[in-house]
Amino acid sequence: MATGTDSPLLPDLVPDVYAAWRASEIGAITEQLQRRLVLGLLGDVRGRRVLDVGCGDGDLALELWRRGAVVTGIDASLYMIDAARARATREGADISFMVGEAASIPFDAERFDVVVAVTILCFVADAGPVLREIARVLRPGGNLVIGELGKWSLWAAARRIRAWFGSSLWRRGRFRTGGELRHLASQAGLEPGPVFGSIYYPRWQPAARLFAPYDKALSRLTTFGAAFLALSAVKPAHGWDKSSAGFPVMATRSRSA
């Protein structure tokens, strides 16, 4: 299990861990950068049916609701779903939260316009069935945004060391390159766009303050060294034209590390 000072760049069953992380200075900086990248790839979600897979305590789902989306969130943890429902009630948000497994999503095919899945593939034994399930519930022409832990980062290196010293969480953690994420999306029948990176600093508060202003510029150069990677993928429709797939426009395409 993670400690109260660890990052929700990893999953945990205790909602208070996430709240404590977001309340810390490094957590607030890191969450802002991660959120900016994911929301930029999602684009305008007003009126769109969005499924948040692995929604945790509902933080991203609430932001999508504020932006006008019709949001559903699922998570394997009842503790997280209870926390998400409580937050939605306090805010008066009309969001449906339910317990559900990413590899067996409890909805009919082609139900959603958009699916977002942030840091869930890194903790499943086989990402293939999860992405195939996501593709199943996504309508033709719909978008998936994936956010995952980058393989070649200082955060990943520290977590590997923790695994060597007995961390059961990080022994099962999987860090991926941008190319691997694109391949997984393609194997599920989706058409992946470019991969973008974020969080290039080590898990150290002064470094976060120093490097955060340069995060977007670094993402334009490379995904190597990024603790967080994200991409958008489209589910092909009949007669689908790749040139008009509708990937959200980012300033510059990043190279996949």
Task: Please report, for each region that a protein language model flagged, where it lies by residue.
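A C-terminal cap/extension of S-adenosyl-L-methionine-dependent methyltransferases
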Residues: P192-A257
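Acceptor-substrate binding/catalytic loop of class I
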Residues: A163-E180
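Short catalytic micro-motifs in class I SAM-dependent methyltransferases
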Residues: T119-C122
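A conserved beta-strand element that flanks and buttresses the S-adenosyl-L-methionine
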Residues: V116
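A short glycine-rich, Lys/Arg-flanked "PGG" loop and its adjoining helix->strand segment in the class I
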Residues: G128-P140
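Conserved class I S-adenosyl-L-methionine
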Residues: M1-R46, D59, E63, N143-S168, Q205-P206
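Class I SAM-dependent methyltransferase SAM/SAH-binding core
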Residues: L51, D57-S104
